[in-house]
């Protein structure tokens, strides 16, 4: 995009202050503690509607204040506009956010890549392939809805899983991997059970919203 701004790089306005509930604060503190000490991967586990994204955005905001960048992966291209708006409203004023997916034009991708190498991007929001982007001073890789099968590529080659690439990258860049979902994959659940991965749990929904009522109906008729 010679002579004009790259429309796939947004600037945050920081309009909304992130106020966490007590439950969210506990999860946020667990992530901060791991980042400050062991840098073990953390699983942010909470029901749909618990506000996991706000916990992650608050942590990303802290990293930006320290001069560190984040890569945030979502499973579907359709989710990027919604998250892009959230990032622009919640991240610190002036933070630069790059959007990366298969819909990003090649010219825009070149501009994003050059900006990443120059260290002028604070956060990347993208789908699976964004896991390979060269974020300067990487602080965190976050994979939202970690259990989703779209994070695994089998064809075309090379085959890879974004979760495994994230774990490898953070181990070589003094960063932290954070996974989030209401329904962890069996692989991550096993790592939590073995204490390879730490668990940051949010017990209920944000704003004291109630959980759905579950009923199991009888689908048979008694035999007489």
Predicted regions and their residues:
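Conserved interdomain linker/interface between the two RecA-like ATPase lobes of SF2 helicase motors
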Residues: 25, 168-224
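Conserved helicase motor "Helicase C" RecA-like lobe of SF1/SF2 P-loop NTPases
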Residues: 80-96
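Flexible beta-alpha connector loops of hexameric P-loop NTPases
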Residues: 98-106, 148-160, 222-224
């Amino acid at each position: 995009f010679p002579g004009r701004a790259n429309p796939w790089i947004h600037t945050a306005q920081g309009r909304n202050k992130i106020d966490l509930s007590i439950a969210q604060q506990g999860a946020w503190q667990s992530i901060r503690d791991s980042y400050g000490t062991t840098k073990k991967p953390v699983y942010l586990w909470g029901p749909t509607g618990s506000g996991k994204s706000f916990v992650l955005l608050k942590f990303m905001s802290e990293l930006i204040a320290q001069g560190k960048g984040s890569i945030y992966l979502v499973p579907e291209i359709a989710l990027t506009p919604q998250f892009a708006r959230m990032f622009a409203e919640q991240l610190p004023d002036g933070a630069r956010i790059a959007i990366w997916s298969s819909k990003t034009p090649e010219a825009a991708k070149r501009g994003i890549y050059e900006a990443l190498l120059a260290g002028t991007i604070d956060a990347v929001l993208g789908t699976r392939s964004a896991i390979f982007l060269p974020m300067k001073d990487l602080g965190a890789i976050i994979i939202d809805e970690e259990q989703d099968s779209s994070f695994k590529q089998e064809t075309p080659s090379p085959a890879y899983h974004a979760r495994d690439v994230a774990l490898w990258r953070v181990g070589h860049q003094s960063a932290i991997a954070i996974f989030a979902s209401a329904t962890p994959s069996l692989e991550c659940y096993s790592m939590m059970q073995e204490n390879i991965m730490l668990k940051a749990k949010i017990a209920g929904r944000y704003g004291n919203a109630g959980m759905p009522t579950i009923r199991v109906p009888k689908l048979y008729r008694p035999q007489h």
